């Protein structure tokens, strides 16, 4: 079995009718495939959108609401209805499902991040199928993960999945928008995600969901940097899930980084919030970027912001002002500044185990999305 632990993500358009309402037939198609894979021995996680779509009709809205409060109320009703559909279908095949609602704060806080990963691991060990969505009812708009493509990649990285499959209404990444450009060609295999790939993704999207092709490229970047391969393929094919699990999907395949980031490094790179900045001299820059060493106090050339011990900070080159990476500090900003002034700056400021260098792909995540 090439891919045992698989995360599938289905978007709103993959489980709804053209009017935006929930399609029980489409959900049954997905759960039928999940059940077959589960019984074949795969460990499965489903990240599913559709809570708003499932709930807005029950609240008397004629169409999908636009106002934030209306969407959150619809999600509150719809999440239960959505889970009811998934649970009924999976339980008829003898499969236990579990609901997990996550938010950006669950990833930003290291302890909550570890707890979520632990719960998911137990569910998979006990042969349950976790069904995950963002907690839309209570999430603050400015602090949301924002789309389930990104959420699915974060989950896949967290549990060290063998494969992430992003199911959509477009069968992969094209050189242009296939709906409007007859000359657009699908890319079947993507070795590296760069500016050109991001430009290609800018024109594709769907009317009902919030995650267009650009968010799928962001998700693919997070996953592949974490060592997880990614398929983007159409949910419209009756055996799309099985084909992806068998490495035969009709879509775009993203090749993972040869040595994926460990969980601690993932958290530093993608989720930890930087509380300040540190500028380092040329020697420290070389030690961090080229030799994989810890950052010593003696290499610090400047500090900005206010941060505490074990906070995450961004480290910059004094010469170029470009970010070199992120790390958790062993001294707060006040203590570090005092030591620097007294010329008693000795010891380790950021240990190499709590450091992540910014690769070109991670830089794209920080600057392009």
UniProtKB/Swiss-Prot annotation:
GO cellular component: cytosol
Residues the record lists as binding ATP: 9, 168-169, 210-216
Record-linked InterPro entries: AceGlu_kinase-like_sf, Asp/Glu/Uridylate_kinase, G5K_ProB, Glu/AcGlu_kinase, Glu_5kinase, Glu_5kinase/COase_Synthase, Glutamate_5-kinase_CS, PUA
EC code(s) of this entry: 2.7.2.11
Keyword NADP (UniProt): no
UniProt keyword Transcription present: no
Pfam families linked to this entry: AA_kinase, PUA
UniProt keywords, alphabetically: Amino-acid biosynthesis, ATP-binding, Cytoplasm, Kinase, Nucleotide-binding, Proline biosynthesis, Transferase
Domain of life from the UniProt record: Bacteria
Pathway: Amino-acid biosynthesis; L-proline biosynthesis; L-glutamate 5-semialdehyde from L-glutamate: step 1/2
Gene3D superfamilies for this protein: Acetylglutamate kinase-like (3.40.1160.10), PUA domain (2.30.130.10)
Substrates-to-products reaction catalysed: L-glutamate + ATP = L-glutamyl 5-phosphate + ADP
EC supergroup of this enzyme: transferase
UniProt-recorded name of the protein: Glutamate 5-kinase
Native source organism of the sequence: Neisseria meningitidis serogroup A / serotype 4A (strain DSM 15465 / Z2491)
């Amino acid at each position: 079995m090439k891919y045992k632990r698989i995360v599938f993500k289905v978007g709103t358009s993959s489980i709804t009718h053209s009017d935006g309402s929930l399609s029980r037939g489409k959900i049954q198609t997905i759960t039928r495939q999940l059940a077959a894979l589960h019984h074949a021995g795969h460990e499965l996680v489903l990240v599913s959108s559709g809570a708003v779509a499932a709930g807005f009709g029950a609240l008397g809205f004629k169409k999908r609401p636009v106002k934030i409060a209306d969407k959150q109320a619809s999600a509150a009703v719809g999440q239960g209805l959505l889970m009811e559909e998934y649970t009924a279908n999976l339980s008829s095949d003898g499969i236990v499902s579990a609901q997990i609602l996550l938010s950006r704060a669950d990833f930003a806080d290291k302890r909550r991040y570890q707890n979520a990963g632990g719960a998911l691991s137990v569910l998979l060990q006990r042969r349950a199928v976790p069904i995950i969505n963002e907690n839309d009812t209570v999430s603050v708009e400015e602090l949301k993960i924002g789309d389930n493509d990104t959420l699915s990649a974060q989950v896949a990285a967290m549990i060290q999945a063998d494969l992430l499959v992003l199911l959509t209404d477009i069968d992969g990444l094209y050189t242009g928008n296939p709906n409007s450009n007859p000359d657009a060609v699908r890319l079947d295999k993507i070795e590296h995600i760069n500016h050109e790939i991001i430009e290609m993704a800018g024109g594709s999207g769907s009317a009902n969901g919030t995650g267009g092709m650009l968010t799928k490229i962001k998700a693919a970047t997070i996953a592949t940097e974490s060592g997880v391969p990614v398929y983007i393929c159409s949910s419209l094919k009756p055996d799309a899930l099985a084909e992806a699990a068998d490495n035969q999907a009709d879509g775009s395949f993203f090749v993972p980084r040869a040595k994926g980031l460990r969980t601690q490094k993932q958290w530093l790179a993608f989720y930890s919030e930087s509380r300040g900045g540190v500028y380092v001299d040329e020697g420290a820059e070389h030690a961090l970027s080229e030799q994989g060493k810890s950052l010593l106090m003696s290499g610090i050339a400047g500090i900005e912001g206010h941060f505490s011990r074990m906070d995450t900070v961004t480290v910059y080159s004094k010469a170029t002002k470009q970010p070199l990476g992120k790390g958790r500090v062993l001294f707060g900003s006040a203590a570090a500044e005092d030591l620097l002034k007294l010329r008693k700056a000795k010891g380790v400021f950021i240990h190499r185990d709590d450091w992540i260098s910014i690769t070109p792909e991670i830089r794209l995540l920080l600057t392009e999305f």
